[in-house]
């Protein structure tokens, strides 16, 4: 059985938790009436076992089973480190 793992990229907006961080996923949607493209943001709580991701990093995350009330994504890799 070949499952296609759904991954998304986003920017880390908070890394204050232990083994977790919050990532903001940005997407564009078309306004239903006016047709203008608008930026929409979704925040996801992500599990990070080794505390690799830091504030400002661009990361790739994937869906997984629910790990807690809010966490249902895990870190795949850090795509780009934040400039210190």
From Swiss-Prot:
One of the primary rRNA binding proteins, it binds specifically to the 5'-end of 16S ribosomal RNA. This is Small ribosomal subunit protein uS17. InterPro entries: NA-bd_OB-fold (IPR012340), Ribosomal_uS17 (IPR000266), Ribosomal_uS17_bact/chlr (IPR019984), Ribosomal_uS17_CS (IPR019979). Part of the 30S ribosomal subunit. Pfam families: Ribosomal_S17. GO terms for biological process: translation. One of its GO terms (cellular component) is cytosolic small ribosomal subunit. The keyword Ribonucleoprotein applies. HAMAP family: Ribosomal_uS17_B. The keyword Ribonucleoprotein applies. It comes from Glaesserella parasuis serovar 5 (strain SH0165) (Haemophilus parasuis). It comes from the Bacteria. Belongs to the universal ribosomal protein uS17 family. GO terms for molecular function: rRNA binding; structural constituent of ribosome.
């Amino acid at each position: 059985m070949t499952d296609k793992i759904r991954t998304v990229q986003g920017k880390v907006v908070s890394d204050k938790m232990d083994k977790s961080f919050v990532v903001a996923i940005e997407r564009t949607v078309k306004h239903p009436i006016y047709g203008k493209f608008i930026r929409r943001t979704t925040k996801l709580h992500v599990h990070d076992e080794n505390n690799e991701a830091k504030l400002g990093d661009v990361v790739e995350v994937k869906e997984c089973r629910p790990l807690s009330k809010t966490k249902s994504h895990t870190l795949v890799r850090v795509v780009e480190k934040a400039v210190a």
